[in-house]
Design a protein with these regions (language model features):
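A short amphipathic helical element positioned immediately N-terminal to and/or at the very start
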Residues: 5-14, 85-88
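Membrane-proximal extracellular/periplasmic loop immediately following the first transmembrane helix
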Residues: 37-108, 223-228, 376-380, 384
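Hydrophobic alpha-helical transmembrane segments of polytopic membrane proteins
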Residues: 375-402
Length: 402
């Protein structure tokens, strides 16, 4: 029976090639657009290595500080200083881990004090390596003790190791120069896609091995700086409890700041909210975001559906004579309708396959532009896009059903 439906669908394609082709391509384009839009959102929230725990992560990207002597709406906004990160978040009891790390930056690496290469860098603590699941090719991450001691150790990516040493193995323990300072390579990890917006870098070093926590990198009595915080909950159901604990720590921290006081603007954020928090002084409007997504999907679904329905109506009108003949030879109304529906489902399935191919082609050719994080566009490397990061079978099925 199914084979017969396919034959009849192909027959319709031959009899009405223009209408059928437009119908198939229109449906395919709709499915393609829906999948691309969904994947643009998924890449920000769906777990993939090394951010496999995204569903359990909370983020504090920005901090706001006010002063009792400033105007009512006066505030300084941006990354926090190490003093604030430790005072408000270090040692939280509810979560599994808390990591303090720097905003993305660039460091110069070399094997000598001669020719240097710029690479994307993060400065972290030891907990960072327990939150994110990097794949180590050689060596291991630096420890909490090495971080607290400010030892000059570094983890580098496979591509950086090959650039410096010509190989990614047997590199641990060797010396490199980072911003003209000697560092020991602690480990080598597989290259990380910049789509992993929190974990991504090409080199990671302990934040106490540089001057990033002092000097010109802090202001407002050390309250503000260049640090951020990521929290790994034991379970996503603990998010509200963790936020409440963070609020208690904030109040206790403010008690020792004199005229200054810090506030979170709704943070810590889950992964989705964090992806929409662009500005340090503006809390994201998540209700508006969801409304916008609904409107986009309605437009993507309704406009092609209205156009395609008129084409389907034209096709059916041309088959009125055929339907009349079949009815006169004893075919039931339900049987005729069922066959027409089945034929249209076959055409929809064909369109779905074409739409999937369109989507994969677009993702392959323009993926770096479509899915790049605008906040990381200044980095040295182009975004690495892998199919397993983007394509979910459920996305294709939902797009096909709608």
């Amino acid at each position: 029976m199914i084979k017969q439906y396919f034959k009849q669908a192909l027959s319709q394609l031959k009899q009405q090639p223009l209408l059928t082709t437009i119908s198939v391509l229109g449906t395919a384009l709709t499915i393609c657009l829906i999948m691309v839009v969904v994947m643009q959102q998924q890449i920000k929230t769906v777990p993939f290595a090394p951010e496999s725990n995204r569903n359990r992560l909370l983020h504090v990207k920005w901090m706001s500080v006010g002063n009792k002597t400033w105007s009512d709406d006066g505030s300084s906004n941006g990354p926090m200083g190490i003093k604030t990160a430790k005072g408000c978040f270090e040692g939280l009891k509810t979560p599994e881990e808390v990591s303090i790390y720097s905003i993305p930056g660039t460091m110069q690496v070399s094997l000598s004090r001669g020719v240097r290469t710029g690479v994307d860098a993060l400065e972290t603590d030891g907990a960072f390596w327990r939150i994110f699941d990097f794949s180590f090719i050689d060596g291991k991450p630096y420890s909490d003790a090495e971080t607290k001691s400010g030892l000059p150790v570094a983890v580098i990516t496979e591509s950086v190791a090959r650039l410096l040493f010509g190989t990614a193995t047997n590199v641990a323990g060797k010396e490199i120069f980072v911003n003209d300072a000697p560092y020991r390579v602690s480990g080598v990890v597989k290259d990380v896609s910049s789509m992993a917006s929190t974990a991504y870098a090409q080199i990671w070093v302990p934040y106490l091995s540089t001057n990033i926590t002092g000097g010109d990198n802090v202001w407002n009595d050390g309250i503000m700086g260049v640090m951020q915080v990521v929290i790994l909950a034991r379970n996503s159901s603990d998010f509200d409890v963790i936020r409440a604990e963070c609020e208690r720590r904030r109040l206790a921290y403010n008690a020792g700041l004199g005229d200054y006081f810090v506030f979170y603007r709704g943070q810590p954020d889950d992964q989705l909210t964090m992806s929409q928090r662009i500005w340090a002084n503006v809390q994201p409007d998540m209700a508006g975001y969801f409304r916008q997504q609904v409107i986009i999907f309605l437009i993507l679904l309704l406009v092609p559906a209205i156009n395609l329905s008129s084409m389907t109506h034209s096709r059916l009108r041309q088959r009125v004579a055929e339907i009349g003949v079949r009815r006169s030879f004893g075919a039931t109304r339900g049987g005729v309708m069922g066959q027409i529906v089945a034929e249209n489902l076959v055409l929809t399935l064909m369109a779905g396959v074409v739409g999937l191919l369109f989507c994969l082609l677009i993702s392959y050719v323009w993926g770096g532009t479509l899915f790049a994080d605008s906040q990381l566009m200044h980095l040295n490397t182009a975004p690495v896009i892998e199919w397993k990061m983007l394509f979910k079978l459920s996305t294709f099925i939902y797009a096909l059903l709608f």
